[in-house]
């Protein structure tokens, strides 16, 4: 039987300060799983040096690194969807490039998947380096979302997760423009297990989630999940 393959999907938007260090840690984590793997970067319209660095990585690591690029900024959720559309793996792992979600947790996620989980989602026990305002609004948002949803959505989670291929295939059949991965994952009803962790501070640079983008994501989540 052929060994199962893993796809790591990383949306990128103006991340030249952290990209190369992030790649080193991501690649080390994927190698530690012992599985064949691919790392898929989706450039979400960056206009700094991000794309140049991505081209360098693809040229230096042609067997494992693949790069796709949008003509403009379409948003995090559509960038993730693009990566999923092109992924070949038996399991798909979604992670942000900024190293707040430690790549070193990936081998543990893979082990939980091999033990039977269809979805392994990161559950944040603590959020380092975030302002009181950000922590408070996040807490209010997740509880509001949970109270309005027609189905249970785990609290204090983001898009850091592993999806079995069958889960990804169902997700990709749903082509809504306003996408909300964590809610859609919960709605599908597959076996999902949490992996608890402490979310780190950003390794470099600033968050690209402006207040406007956060409000839009919140609205998408509430409208997609409400009964």
Annotate the PLM regions:
Residues 219, 223-227:
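Alpha-helical membrane-interface segments at transmembrane helix boundaries
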Residues 1-131:
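Structured catalytic core of nucleotide-sugar glycosyltransferases
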Residues 16, 30, 117, 148, ...:
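A general structural signal marking secondary-structure boundaries and capping sites
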Residues 190-192, 198:
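Histidine/lysine/aspartate-rich catalytic loop segments that bind and position anionic ligands
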Residues 56, 68-86, 100-184, 200-219:
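Acceptor/aglycone-binding surface of glycosyltransferases and processive sugar-polymer synthases
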Residues 187:
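Flexible glycine/serine/alanine-rich "lid" or loop that lines and gates the nucleotide-sugar donor pocket
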């Amino acid at each position: 039987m052929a060994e199962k393959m893993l796809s790591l999907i990383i949306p990128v938007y103006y991340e030249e300060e952290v990209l190369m260090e992030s790649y080193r840690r991501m690649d080390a984590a994927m190698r530690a799983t012992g599985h064949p793997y691919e790392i898929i970067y989706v450039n979400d319209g960056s206009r700094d040096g991000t794309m140049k660095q991505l081209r360098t990585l693809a040229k230096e690591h042609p067997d494992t690194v693949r790069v796709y690029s949008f003509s403009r900024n379409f948003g995090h959720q559509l960038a993730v969807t693009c990566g999923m559309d092109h992924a070949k793996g038996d399991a798909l792992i979604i992670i942000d490039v900024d190293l707040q979600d430690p790549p070193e947790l990936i081998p543990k996620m893979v082990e939980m998947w091999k033990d039977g989980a269809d979805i392994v989602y990161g559950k944040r026990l603590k959020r380092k380096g975030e302002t009181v305002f950000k922590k408070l609004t996040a807490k209010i948002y997740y509880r509001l979302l949970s109270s309005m949803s027609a189905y249970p959505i785990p609290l204090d989670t983001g898009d850091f997760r592993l999806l079995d291929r069958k889960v990804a295939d169902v997700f990709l059949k749903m082509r809504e423009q306003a996408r909300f991965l964590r809610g859609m994952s919960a709605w599908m009803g597959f076996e999902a297990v949490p992996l608890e962790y402490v979310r780190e501070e950003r390794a470099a640079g600033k968050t690209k989630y402006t207040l406007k983008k956060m409000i839009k994501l919140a609205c998408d989540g509430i409208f997609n999940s409400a009964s």
